[in-house]
Structures are given as C-alpha cells and as structure tokens.
C-alpha cells in the first residue's frame, strides 16, 4: 500500500545541508495500522509528508497504492491525494466555520452537490459521535471533540489511507484512549490503512500491528508490535518499550541480589505469550534441572489484546549443571529466551 525504497530527504538552508531522512526502506501493507515512532527530530513527520507529496524525496522511491509518486507533479498528485486523509496534532480546523462546514470543506472544494455533502457529512459526524455538535464552532469543543471533527473531515472523501501525525500528543490519557479506539474502528469498519506518527510507545502498544523505530533520520528497527515488545534489538527500541512495560528488574535490584548470591549462577530472561501463560513452566524447569528455580522478576502486560509475561529466572550452578536441557525446553515450547549470565 505504501512503500519506501531507499528514501533520503535533505534540506538546504543557507550553506548548510540537513539530512532529515537517510536510506529509509519499509512497507506499510494494506489494512495495517502501522506505527512510526521516534524522538523529536528523528524524521517522522518528514517521512509522512512524503506520502501525500507535501515534501518530495531527494533520493529513492515512494510508492503509494502501486503508484511511484516520487517525481509526480502537483497535477499528477490530485487523484492520488483524494485517496489520502490526514489528521494533525493541533487539529487544523477553521474556527470561523461550524463543525458541519469544517467536515464538509473537502467536499465543497471538490464541488459536490449539496445533497451529497449533507448526506456524507451527516454519516461521518454520526460515526465519530458528534451529530449533536454539527452547529457548534471549534472553540466550543474539547480537544478530543476537535480531533473527532478532524477525523470526520479526513474520512469524508472516503480515503484508502489515513495519515496521523502526532494525532494524540495534545490530548490527555483518557481522551487519547478514546481517539485510539475510534481510529481502530476506522480501520476495521472501512478497511482504511493507517500510518501513525508518534513519540509515545503506548500508542504503538494499544493500536498498531506493525512498527518502525526511527533515530536520526534512519529506520533502525522494524517488525510486528509483538516482536519489538518481546525482543527489542536496538537501545532506542528498548528505551521506548521500557516507558510502558517493565521487562526486567532494576539494575539496583540485580546488583543487590548478586551481592547476596552464594556460588555460581546463570540467569535467563524469558518472554511468555498468552497461550503459554497458563503452562507450568517453573515446575517443568525444576523437574528438568533437578534444582530450585528462583524468579527474580515477573511482569504481565497486554499487547494487542494478548496477555504476555516477562520473567527473569535464576539457576544455581555446580559441576552437574547442564543448561542444554533447559535451552531445549524453551525451544520446544517456543518460548523466547536470552541467557544473561
């Protein structure tokens, strides 16, 4: 649906060249809710602006719905843009226009009939839960209601793609949750592909099925949300995951436990998925290795509606200790594990 092929984007200011994007490659599949996460200045917003040609790539290719738009003119982009809706952090509503007229604006500009405009706007306001606000003005609405108006406006042209640039960053946690629920409903009801730009890992965790992690203009990690949460490969991905889920004990706790430890030991970090949570893993390990298993840390969370568990286990070691059977058990049970010591 959306594909970036070795995309780079540079800005030239005075005598300075700023590389906003460097060799970015990944694909957003049809019906995905695809998250792009990174800190401020990572290049996220520049990336999403390439999709609707608000910016043009310096190098590489941008493919949108099978069209290579990299070198498209504004005229060539007109039909493509009809299939792309966009919402922003600060809503971008017309304060002098009613809610109805704000939502209707794309149809008015497309010179649709009054009958079609009324029918379509009414449908969208009902979908976002604002039918009773149609005659009010943006200044009379809450932040969450303003974003719902923006979503209705983005959907009124029946797009295939919805771009969300920090759409929940200006909202409180409760309102954010309601907007994310609405966006998930947009995806499921209309089959719209959503590309989410955010710096909040909780947004990725709650709504996205796939994610790309950006740092300094580059994509440093991609995968399903479950893959990235279960085994983040890069430091920045690990840092983002730790903002919403504690996946291991604190350094101070490990240091204290190590100081109290008598004899050699080996630690394992394991990730247990929902289908395995009810399995007698600890009991199995005790029987396999013939010794006690210490649980130094355990944390349960929900990712995409699935319960997952992170554990840190410790085995005391002696000459008879053989980790081969333990490793084999984890592999047979399809439990992701990492030997820590």
Swiss-Prot record:
InterPro entries, sorted: AAA+_ATPase (IPR003593), ABC_transporter-like_ATP-bd (IPR003439), ABC_transporter-like_CS (IPR017871), ACT-like_dom_sf (IPR045865), MetN_ABC (IPR041701), MetN_ABC_transporter-like (IPR050086), NIL_domain (IPR018449), P-loop_NTPase (IPR027417)
Alphabetical list of SMART domains matching this protein: AAA, NIL
Record domain ABC transporter: where: 2-241
Keyword check for Acyltransferase: no
Family in the record: Belongs to the ABC transporter superfamily. Methionine importer (TC 3.A.1.24) family.
Function: Part of the ABC transporter complex MetNIQ involved in methionine import. Responsible for energy coupling to the transport system.
Protein known as: Methionine import ATP-binding protein MetN 1
Species in which this protein is naturally found: Staphylococcus aureus (strain bovine RF122 / ET3-1)
């Amino acid at each position: 649906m959306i594909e970036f092929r070795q995309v780079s984007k540079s800005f030239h200011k005075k005598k300075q060249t700023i590389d906003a994007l460097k060799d970015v490659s990944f694909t957003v599949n049809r019906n995905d809710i695809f998250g792009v996460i990174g800190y401020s200045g990572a290049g996220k917003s520049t990336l999403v602006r390439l999709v609707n040609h608000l910016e043009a790539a310096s190098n590489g290719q941008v493919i949108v719905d099978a069209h290579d738009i990299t070198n498209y003119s504004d005229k060539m982009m007109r039909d493509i843009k009809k299939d792309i809706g966009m919402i922003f952090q600060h809503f971008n509503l017309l304060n002098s226009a009613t809610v109805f007229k704000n939502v209707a604006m794309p149809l008015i500009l497309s010179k649709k009939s009054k009958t079609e405009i009324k029918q379509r706007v009414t449908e969208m306001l009902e979908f976002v839960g604002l039918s009773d606000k149609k005659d009010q003005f943006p200044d009379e609405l809450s932040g969450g209601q303003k974003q719902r108006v923006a979503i209705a406006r983005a959907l009124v042209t029946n797009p295939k793609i919805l771009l969300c640039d920090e759409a929940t960053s200006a909202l409180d946690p409760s309102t954010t949750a309601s907007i994310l629920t609405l966006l998930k409903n947009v995806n499921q009801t209309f089959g719209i592909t959503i590309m989410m730009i955010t710096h909040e890992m909780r947004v990725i965790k709650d709504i996205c099925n796939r994610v790309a992690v950006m740092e300094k203009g580059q994509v440093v990690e991609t995968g399903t949300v479950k893959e990235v949460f279960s085994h983040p490969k890069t430091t920045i991905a690990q840092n983002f995951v730790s903002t919403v889920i504690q996946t291991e004990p604190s350094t101070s706790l490990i240091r204290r436990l190590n100081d109290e430890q008598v004899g050699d030991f080996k630690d394992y970090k394991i990730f247990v998925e929902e289908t395995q949570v009810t399995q007698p893993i600890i009991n199995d390990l005790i029987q396999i290795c013939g010794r006690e298993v210490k649980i130094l840390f355990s944390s349960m969370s929900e990712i995409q509606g699935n319960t997952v568990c992170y554990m840190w286990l410790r085995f005391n070691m002696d000459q008879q200790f053989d980790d081969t059977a333990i490793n084999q058990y984890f592999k047979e049970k399809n439990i992701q594990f990492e030997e820590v010591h």
